[in-house]
Regions:
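A short helix-loop-beta-strand connector motif used in the catalytic cores of GNAT acetyltransferases and
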Residues: 375-388, 397
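C-terminal alpha-helical cap of glycosyltransferases
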Residues: 300, 314-333
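Active-site and donor-binding regions of nucleotide-sugar-utilizing enzymes
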Residues: 11-21, 26-33, 45-58, 62-140
Length: 485
């Protein structure tokens, strides 16, 4: 498919007083990153008017959806996502059944996730939670994964702040926020704690438009001189407020990624089951501390925390996302087929390319007669699955799987003209998808990559391979994926 028109991308996310606004916030952050190149449309059941008004500038259009069961919604996908080139799903109701219905209707879709609970059928999975590995998911073998804080879903003011981040503690002001809803009113519980209040000079408290305890919170804040309340702030206003506070108490949700982009000492309190993994990861990595640690953190631990935050939150996640979407739509032009006799010469040229030989285990040049014999043998071998990938009618890569004893050894080569464009994962994904569809049996797929071949390692690691040290080849890694249809 060649895109002569601007691709249309639908974002499917909801928000309300019960589930909060995190799904809409992070989906809108992603949409704002790519909307200069794509027509972004939000399909939502959210009915909070000022929330929709605040994000309306991001989307070309907002589609208001009725309340119905999600299975019924999925069966109407062709009406909801009319002429969609891509759908981004962000929410727990968009489970395996919902996704399978989209597959039936031949939609292409990504998932934004944070709990890796149900099976996924998405082309790409984005999870900025940290500590999650591709093989922790039950997904299609060709699914690509973009995981960890390097892929934080942040709005532009927070990305800009990360490039000028705070690197030392200069006050005892505390930023407090538990998301857009805070249904259990954790905000007020924290502020009422004498043990917490005694450690900070000021509290700057932000609540969202879905927060229903505003009057109760205001009555308490009015009784204290050092508690200041804010509601429904813009992202620019939140950044400004965060810059005034060297400490934060918040939930392990989108807000903590935003605060860590500004930089500061974070104390986390879990308010939802899906936050358990994030809180373990962030405290385990020293990025944040538990709320019970308030008053017990040494200065050196705070310094190390700020340093680690600066490593993960570099303000460049928007660049990474734009690259992912460019590669995805570029890759949709790829066509894969079995190798034919006419591919003999191009495969010979690829095999003798200088860069290819340097990363091969046999680095000697290959003669044409030797190559010809090998090529025809592989084409005629029933255990060899030899594919050519084309783009716009031109061969750009070969992917080959050699099956033996329940194992398929994978190898691939790419034409010089497409190297260094980040297409390695797309090529592998295309090849794996074709192979498992052709083979149709349980199989272990294995690839070997030299320690020095960083681009190829990066390509494998965006798929559900397990990485181990190779015992077959020196100075190499072994990548293993088990497929069970």
């Amino acid at each position: 498919m060649i895109y002569n028109k601007v691709p249309k991308i639908f974002f499917r996310a909801d928000g309300n007083e019960k589930i909060g606004l995190g799904h809409i916030t992070r989906s809108s952050a992603l949409a704002s990153t790519i909307n200069s190149d794509y027509d972004c449309i939000l399909a939502t059941r959210c009915k909070i008017s000022h929330v929709l008004e605040a994000i309306s500038y991001i989307y070309k259009h907002i589609v208001q959806l009725p309340e119905t069961d999600f299975h019924s919604e999925a069966t109407r996908a062709s009406d909801i996502f009319e002429n969609a080139d891509l759908i981004i799903l962000d929410g727990y109701p968009f489970d395996a059944g919902y996704q399978q219905e989209l597959l039936k209707q031949e939609f292409d879709f990504f998932s934004i996730d944070d709990i890796h609970a149900s099976p996924f059928f998405s082309r790409i999975i984005i999870n900025h939670g940290g500590g999650i590995r591709p093989f922790d998911y039950k997904a299609r073998p060709a699914t690509q994964f973009y995981l960890g804080p390097s892929y934080s879903l942040l709005r532009k003011p927070f990305l800009d702040a990360a490039k000028k981040r705070r690197n030392k503690v200069i006050n005892k002001n505390c930023f407090v926020c538990f998301g857009g809803a805070d249904p259990e009113n954790k905000t007020l519980e924290i502020l009422r704690s004498d043990n917490i209040r005694e450690h900070f000079e000021q509290f700057h408290v932000v609540t969202g438009s879905a927060y229903i305890y505003k009057e109760e919170l205001k009555r308490f804040a009015d009784s204290k001189e050092n508690i200041f309340l804010y509601s429904s702030l813009s992202s620019e206003e939140i950044v400004s407020l965060m810059k005034q506070c060297c400490f934060a108490i918040c939930s392990p949700s989108t807000i903590v990624y935003e605060y860590m982009s500004v930089g500061g000492i974070v104390f986390l309190e879990q308010i939802a089951d899906n936050q358990e993994h994030v809180i373990k990861y962030m405290t385990g990595e020293g990025l944040a501390f538990l709320i019970n640690d308030i008053g017990n953190i040494e200065e050196n631990s705070m310094k190390l925390s700020l340093e680690k935050q600066s490593f993960y939150f570099d303000g460049r996640s928007d660049e990474r996302f734009r690259k992912i979407f460019r590669q995805h739509f570029y890759g949709k032009n790829m066509v894969i087929r079995r190798a034919e006799n006419m591919d003999l010469q191009i495969c010979f040229n690829w095999a003798n390319d200088k860069a290819v030989r340097e990363q091969s285990y046999n680095q000697n040049p290959i003669g044409f007669d030797e190559h010809t014999e090998w090529f025809h043998q592989k084409r005629n071998d029933p255990d060899s699955f030899f594919y050519i990938i084309e783009m716009d009618g031109e061969p750009i890569a070969q992917v080959r799987f050699q099956v033996s004893g329940g194992e398929a050894v994978l190898g691939y080569l790419a034409d010089e003209k497409i190297r260094n464009k980040g297409l390695g994962t797309a090529i592998l994904s295309k090849g794996i998808e074709k192979f498992v569809n052709d083979y149709r049996n349980p199989i272990q797929i294995v690839g070997y990559v030299k320690n020095s071949n960083y681009p190829s390692q990066h390509s494998f690691e965006k798929l559900a391979f397990v990485k181990t040290k190779s015992t077959k080849y020196p100075d190499s890694f072994k990548y293993t994926m088990y497929y069970d249809n």
